[in-house]
Amino acid sequence: MSAALDYPTTRYDPAPLVDLSARDERARLTESALRAFFNIMATWSIRDADARALLGGVASSTFYDYKRNPARVLDQDKLTRISYLIGIFKALHILHGAELADRWVAMPNRNRIFGGGSPLDYMTRGGTPAMQTVRRLLDARRGGG
């Protein structure tokens, strides 16, 4: 006979899941996501062509329109990409000092995932799956995955 175990409780309510398929939710998140994206790109000194690739290959005119007027509604893919980049930025700043954290994405890396290239090259070529891999790698390094 086994004793029933009580599931641990917490006094905190779980955060609601973000539903990026809902237009209202995307509208709520887009402006701050774009501002964060452009701040990260500036901090990392990323060229506009690479920044456009990180967003999924948007046209130059669209990219500069995002920069001038972030009050819009991005699609789920772009918000997911930005979310990964924000997580990568945060993880790097947890793991490293600011100078290395802000240079890391553009530096050659011997990790076999990157094959001697930079994480930036890997992410621009590999898109969302590559961003997820980099995010998971960094989360694992900081003990979160």
Descriptions of predicted regions:
Residues 1-145:
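Non-transmembrane "mature" sequence context
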